[in-house]
């Protein structure tokens, strides 16, 4: 497996996202078998729109790291997400951003569909655009995969 260089984490100010960021930077030992290296040396770009579940206070201990960047953006904003991919040479995405409180989904289901479905589609399309070559192959380190093989 290729070493992670520039990882985009969506929803990184939420409970799961901020704990994952702490894990990557070696500030937590839970789940060390996931990536094998709890002292991640690549760059983390944390994208969160800071709704009711996002709290940057949970990331005070990483906010001044040279390899950490926070971007306040909504995952449904195609232009913002495309810009983040282009400016940061993203090679991996961990997508935690979501509307998750069931009681809120009853009052306003449209927001849930927009974020959880359309926002995920924006992320997938941005990754595809960033990683797909003109001939239909996808870049992965020094290897190239044809979309028909995947």
Regions found by a protein language model. Give the residues of each.
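N-terminal Rossmann-like NAD(P)+-binding domain of SDR-like oxidoreductases, especially those catalyzing
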Residues: 1-150
């Amino acid at each position: 497996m290729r070493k992670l260089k520039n990882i985009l984490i969506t929803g990184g100010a939420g409970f799961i996202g901020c704990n994952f960021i702490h894990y990557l930077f070696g500030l937590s030992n839970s789940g060390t078998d996931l990536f094998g290296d709890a002292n991640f040396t690549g760059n983390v770009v944390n994208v969160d729109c800071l709704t009711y579940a996002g709290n940057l206070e949970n990331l005070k201990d990483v906010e001044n790291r040279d390899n950490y960047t926070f971007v306040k953006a909504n995952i449904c904003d195609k232009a913002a997400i495309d810009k983040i991919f282009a400016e940061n040479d993203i090679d991996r995405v961990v997508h935690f951003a979501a509307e998750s409180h069931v009681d809120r989904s009853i009052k306003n289901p449209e927001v849930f569909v927009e974020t959880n479905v359309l926002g995920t589609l924006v992320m997938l399309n941005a990754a595809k655009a960033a990683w797909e070559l003109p001939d239909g192959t996808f870049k992965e380190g020094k290897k190239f995969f044809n979309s028909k093989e995947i």
